[in-house]
Regions:
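Methionine residue identity
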Residues: 1-3
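Basic polycationic patches enriched in arginine
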Residues: 6-7
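Short hydrophobic alpha-helical segments enriched in small aliphatic residues
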Residues: 11-20, 26
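Amphipathic alpha-helical interaction segments
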Residues: 17-21, 31, 82, 174
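Short, Lys/Arg-enriched N-terminal segments with co-localized hydrophobic residues
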Residues: 23-35
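N-terminal, polar/charged subdomain of small-to-medium soluble alpha/beta proteins
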Residues: 35-134, 150-153, 157-182
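Short hydrophobic/aromatic beta-strand micro-patches
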Residues: 139-141
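Helix N-cap motif at beta-to-alpha junctions
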Residues: 143-145
Length: 182
């Protein structure tokens, strides 16, 4: 959907929602807050594999942040699993990105509420990622190491359990099956 049409759609939807909430005697101020918060939601999706250069640049940008004492990184890599005698050559990731970005945002905000974090970046691939390439990059920073270790583990588990991202495992012969997270 072109950007202008998308904005008109969301504006129309927001007006409809506010009128519906008024009719139901629901405080629509909370609705305004929701739509304001929505503007803070970042797009975490990167087309294709996440490159080592992208990861290195992200790390390098934090050298000047001297209040940070610890960083921890998770890199999810596509495995060349052997399934029923066939080797996975790639995974094609798809998602309803708006819903997935909202879920990533909720996970991120919950981690900031639970742990003493300074910074967090999450990136996930969309489209085709070949075996051996990076598909998930989570970068967590804090004044102290204990928080980054605990927070990173928590965030990665929440991503795997909650975010609606679908992976089509493509085999070397171009046949495929839909991935099941374990």
């Amino acid at each position: 959907m072109p950007m202008l049409n998308r904005r008109l759609f969301y504006a129309g939807y927001a007006i409809h929602l506010v009128h519906t909430l008024k009719f139901l005697n629901v405080d629509y101020l909370s609705t305004k807050v929701f739509f304001m918060e929505k503007s803070k939601i970042k797009n975490v999706f990167v087309e294709g594999a996440i490159s080592p250069e992208f990861i290195a640049n992200s790390i390098a940008k934090h050298q000047s942040k001297t209040a940070i004492g610890a960083h921890d990184i998770f890199l999810g890599q596509v495995r060349a699993d052997l399934i029923d005698g066939q080797e996975v050559a790639a995974i094609e990731y798809t998602a309803y990105e708006e819903m997935a970005n909202l879920k990533f945002h909720e996970i991120r905000e919950a981690a900031f509420a639970k742990y003493n974090l300074s910074c967090m970046h999450i990136y996930h691939s969309s489209g085709r990622v070949n075996a051996g390439e990076i598909c998930l990059f989570v970068f967590v920073s804090s004044p102290h190491r204990k928080e980054v270790f605990e927070a990173l583990h928590h965030v990665v588990e929440e991503i795997k359990n909650q975010v609606p991202i679908f992976g089509k495992e493509v085999f070397k012969d171009d046949s495929y099956q839909w991935k099941v997270n374990k």
